[in-house]
Amino acid sequence: MEADNYSPEHSDDGGATPVQDERDSASDDEGNEQRSEPGSPEHQSEDEHSDVEDHKHSSDSGSDNEKGTEHDSEDEHRPRNSSDLENHDASDSENEESHNRIASDSEDDGRRQKNSDSDRSPVKGAASDSDEEPVRHSASDSEDDVPRKQQANDSEDERHIKKTASDSEDEAPAKHRVSDTEDKAPPKQVASDSEDEASPKQVASDSKDEAPPKHAASDSEDEAPPKLAGSDSEDEAPAKRKVSSSEDETPSKHAVSASKVKKSVGSEDKTRGKRAIIDSDDDDDDDVPVKRAASDSEEETHPKGKASDSEDEAPSKQPSDSEEETPAKVAANDSEDEFPRMKRKIVSSDDSDDEDDRKPLQKKKKSPRRSSESDSSDKVDGKKLQASESDEEGEKASKKKKSNIVSDSEDEDAADKSGNKKSRILSDGEDSDSDAASEKPKQKKKKSASSDSEEEDERKSKTETKSADKLFGSESDSENEEENLIADIFGESGDEEEEEFTGFNQEDLEGEKTVTSVNRQQAAAADSDSDDDMKSGKMGDYKSDFDLMLERKKSMSGKQRRNRDGGTFISDADDVVNAMIMKMTEAAEEDRNLNSSKKPALKKLTLLPTVVMHLKKQDLKETFIDSGVMSAIKEWLTPLPDRSLPALKIREELLKILQELPSVSQETLKHSGIGRAIMYLYKHPKESRPNKDIAGKLINEWSRPIFGLTSNYKGMTREEREQRDIEQMPQRRRMSSSGGQTPRRDLDKVLTGEEKALRPGEPGFCARARVPLPSNKDYVVRPKWNVEMETSQYQGSAKKGVSRIDKQMRKFVDIKKKNRFGHAVKISIEGNKMPL
């Protein structure tokens, strides 16, 4: 059970209520004090007035019974870890002892109060300190028996002093409220309060004695069971606040605990039959008036309290009070205090129940919630039966109530984090192994739900892998599929290749396997419609199926047109495009016929200007591609029947247009056959060099996506480009330095002077001049300066150094010009330029 109360993944986020912080700070002190002081006065803080009346007469029987109850309380931790069979044994043994204990009910109630208080502190300790404290406390329970019995006989004055000390130290918020009401009617109110605390817990104990009702008691637990450490002090606070009269100070927590106690009571209709038989057998002789009092007081309080936790408080309080003292006064006092609070809390508890009702419906779990009407009606019958139960069950109830409140009160926190519910259902199946025998029906439901979801995930993962294999192929088939795709698009590469395609770098081809595997993983992640993101609990990262579908559509929109079903955004353009494609195919067919009949094939040439004009329109390019212009272009570029290439002008224009077209999908390339035509031109010996270059670029661009390589260098950052260059350099160096040349170390060591050059006659000496080794250094080509530097300073120094040479050269050039004669010798009148 400690594992249920404290699980590391659901740690306290401190988000419950402000009072929780006080409880957390007090919980450590309370747990430590209860372990260090076995008979500490806080155990007796609430039973002192009842001890005044009854302790003298029944201390011996009370101590004997307490040993039984203590033994039962120690056994309480074990049945939760083993099975509910032991729970039934414990309850039966307690029922057998009920006749002995009724004489000292108030004393037993007081000591049960101690046990419930001390049992709460381990739970708080489990949440706040460590999991070891409940274990230690379970051991210390048996050790504390004797000191508690001794201190039960202490003087009343000592108890008053110790009570005030313990109240101020540990449980000031809750127990001072108890003491406030104790001032009004001390003996009766204290007894009723202590029993009141036991009886609502008793309510929860029935639902816990048979663990299937435990889960039915908090149906939302099936959706979000162990958020257990979510509010550490809440497991104590709701129980104590049912005791306290000033409940309106903490309405929020009461609303939570109210709705949860209501749920636990509502679930007990499953166990009523068994309980009624056991309890009526044990208590018929003693508790007949109690039952009547309970039924009377319940009928008064039910109309107001059906949906609130005051239903648990008032009715259970009155029958338990009537066991010892006059029930009318206590019922009056309690109901006066409780009825206003009932009215206040009905609304809040109903709201919280409605919220909890909605959540299982939204999550579509298999344990449907009972309606609130059936809960309240079951509670009416159940409380009459439970009022007759002996008070010996109070101790058992206190511990089971504690765990029930822990699990139930967390449902509100679990509602805030509903994204984690599925994972919690799976973990609850593991955590609830402590209730293994009793929880089998519920665990079967949970296991079936978890197994169903796991099967769905497996199916989805299988379909994802299949779709990924369809898109990218498995690793074993990736190379074959790439080869097949290349063969389909560009044709089989036979031995008749005149020119080898050198489009790819070797590094790109080497890295293609890793790239394709990465792409496959990305595609599988993109195609996954599973709820893995939900299960991880990271709601921020979660993307709905609709978002994933949109992203897929966007990624496909570049390759495929969205509306291929005939509905287009430019209806008249479609007509133009289709007519153009029809004309192109007809012209190609006519040219083939003319060529086969040995006539000049000029139809394509005459139609070429019109085709180029339309294909260059930017807004029609996508429409052309979708309408099948690629197959028409292939018809124009394929050789004629006499194996002659089409006109050079046709090839040039169409290759340029193909280069300008947007990215073409692999399906289009495969079905149109344009790749084979381009590859034929690329390999053809009579094709012009510019056309071969364009064809090589096209092949490179179209085949890169098949190998998962990028062709967009503009999109690469500078660092990526530098990294790519660095990765390519060593292979180039290896390629350049490989060959039958002298080893590199000789030149390096000779140049550095470490090793002397080989002399003639020494091994390894070659008696001939050698070509120098290629450099092993990496040189990065420095690009031209795009920014004009301030060249004035450089120009000034250059002028000073070169000015004389420039002057002499200019003079020399001028003299040459003067000495040269024109075509006709001009005779100057003055005779200056006449040749002598």
Curated annotation (Swiss-Prot):
One of its GO terms (cellular component) is nucleus. It is found in: Nucleus. Residues 1-542, 714-746 are annotated as: Disordered. Residues 20-36, 43-122, 133-148, 157-186, 206-218, 288-309, 370-386, 458-469, 533-542, 716-727 have a biased composition (Basic and acidic residues). The keyword Manganese does not apply. PROSITE patterns: TFIIS_N. Residues 631-709 form the TFIIS N-terminal domain. Gene3D superfamilies: Conserved domain common to transcription factors TFIIS, elongin A, CRSP70. InterPro entries: RNAPII_TF_IWS1, TFIIS/LEDGF_dom_sf, TFIIS_N. GO terms for biological process: mRNA processing; poly(A)+ mRNA export from nucleus; RNA splicing. Keywords: mRNA processing, mRNA splicing, mRNA transport, Nucleus, Transcription, Transcription regulation, Transport. Residues 476-485 have a biased composition (Acidic residues). Belongs to the IWS1 family. Transcription factor which plays a key role in defining the composition of the RNA polymerase II (RNAPII) elongation complex and in modulating the production of mature mRNA transcripts. This is Protein IWS1 homolog A. It comes from Xenopus laevis (African clawed frog). The lineage of its organism: Eukaryota, Metazoa, Chordata, Craniata, Vertebrata. The gene is iws1-a.
